[in-house]
Amino acid sequence: MAYAAVLLDIEGTVCPISFVKESLFPFFLKQVDTLCSSQDLQVQRLLTQFQVDDVAGHIRSLVARDVKDPILKQLQGLVWENGYKDGQIKAPVYDDAIKFIKNSDVPVYIYSSGSVKAQKLLFQYVESRSNTLDLRPFIKGYFDINTSGVKTQSESYARIANNVGIKPNGVLFISDNPFELDAAKITGMQTMLAVRPGNSEVRDALKYNPVTNFDDL
């Protein structure tokens, strides 16, 4: 399989699918009331965009339903930044993914529903035997739903390919979500299904070119 760039999903692909829902979401939810009473201008500007009376309740509802809301994603990035910086959060990136990102012969890009800010934090504070590891120097660029669109729409992948200056058929996209892979494939991208512990079982997984370890790439 020849490709000129790799586009990676995060949750369920380079780190356990449980990390977001069992670590990041609970950390954020504990800060919702404090967030809503914050006098920070950036936070207030984001909160007013919800245009609802019960902002805290609305935020909790979005998180509970795992809604990919762009305003919510930006707020989460701001809250998680504090958690990463004070050592309360470390990202459990798979060892084989770390090795692949560090040693890839082609540019590595990230595409996640989480904000670009949250993505950079995750890769800046990767859990390792020596405290934390910063993978940002090895990652060429980041894309999210604000910059590129929803991950289940083919137009999003066309935008990314155009942005990186590589034809879609020269990009390999790896994700645990078959709907995302279907969307990417429409543009001509090469695709692989990430099969990791805890991921949902995918019907007809073989047709999605499954990979269980990035050492096999």
Curated annotation (Swiss-Prot):
Its cofactor is Mg(2+). One of its GO terms (cellular component) is cytoplasm. Mg(2+) binds at D9, E11, D176. Its EC number is 3.1.3.77. InterPro entries: Enolase-ppase_E1, ENOPH1_eukaryotes, HAD-like_sf, HAD_sf. It catalyses: 5-methylsulfanyl-2,3-dioxopentyl phosphate + H2O = 1,2-dihydroxy-5-(methylsulfanyl)pent-1-en-3-one + phosphate. Binds 1 Mg(2+) ion per subunit. Pathway: Amino-acid biosynthesis; L-methionine biosynthesis via salvage pathway; L-methionine from S-methyl-5-thio-alpha-D-ribose 1-phosphate: step 3/6; Amino-acid biosynthesis; L-methionine biosynthesis via salvage pathway; L-methionine from S-methyl-5-thio-alpha-D-ribose 1-phosphate: step 4/6. Monomer. Pfam families: Hydrolase (PF00702). Signal peptide: none annotated. Keywords: Amino-acid biosynthesis, Cytoplasm, Hydrolase, Magnesium, Metal-binding, Methionine biosynthesis, Nucleus. The keyword Lipid metabolism does not apply. Its main location: cytoplasm. The gene is UTR4. Bifunctional enzyme that catalyzes the enolization of 2,3-diketo-5-methylthiopentyl-1-phosphate (DK-MTP-1-P) into the intermediate 2-hydroxy-3-keto-5-methylthiopentenyl-1-phosphate (HK-MTPenyl-1-P), which is then dephosphorylated to form the acireductone 1,2-dihydroxy-3-keto-5-methylthiopentene (DHK-MTPene). This is Enolase-phosphatase E1. It is found in: Cytoplasm; Nucleus. One of its GO terms (biological process) is L-methionine salvage from methylthioadenosine. The keyword Cytoplasm applies. It comes from the Eukaryota. One of its GO terms (molecular function) is magnesium ion binding. Belongs to the HAD-like hydrolase superfamily. MasA/MtnC family. It comes from Lachancea thermotolerans (strain ATCC 56472 / CBS 6340 / NRRL Y-8284) (Yeast). HAMAP family: Salvage_MtnC_euk. Substrate binds at S112, S113, K151.
